[in-house]
Amino acid sequence: MKKSEIFASVLADVSAETEIDSDRILSSERKEEVVDARYLVIFLLLGNGFYPAMIAERMGLSARAVRSAISGFEARLANSAGLRLVCQRLAAKWMA
């Protein structure tokens, strides 16, 4: 699968699983559930061989924002049972 196809599929899967529109995930919206979904997309893309700069380019973020999301993902995961459940389901598909 091409990188562009992986990106689109991961984004669509996270959007479907979280019931948050992909446009909102890619926006600068700061609501907790949207930020969690954005971080999850970044985590899954990283696990599929994307570099932070590649993720940043595709998501319209700075590389620094992506690195911050990567370093803060475990803390968000530890504090959100809902995010953990969604992450487990999607990681089984995308990280296998």
Give residue spans per PLM region.
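Helix-turn-helix DNA-binding helix
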Residues: 65-67
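Residues within the helices of the helix-turn-helix
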Residues: 12, 53
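Short, amphipathic alpha-helical "recognition" segments used to contact nucleic acids or chromatin
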Residues: 34-50
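Short, Lys/Arg-enriched anionic-surface-contact patches
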Residues: 16-38
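DNA major-groove recognition helix of helix-turn-helix
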Residues: 46, 70, 74-77
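Short alpha-helical "recognition helix" segments of helix-turn-helix
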Residues: 54-58
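Short Lys/Arg-enriched helix C-cap and helix-to-coil transition segments
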Residues: 76-96
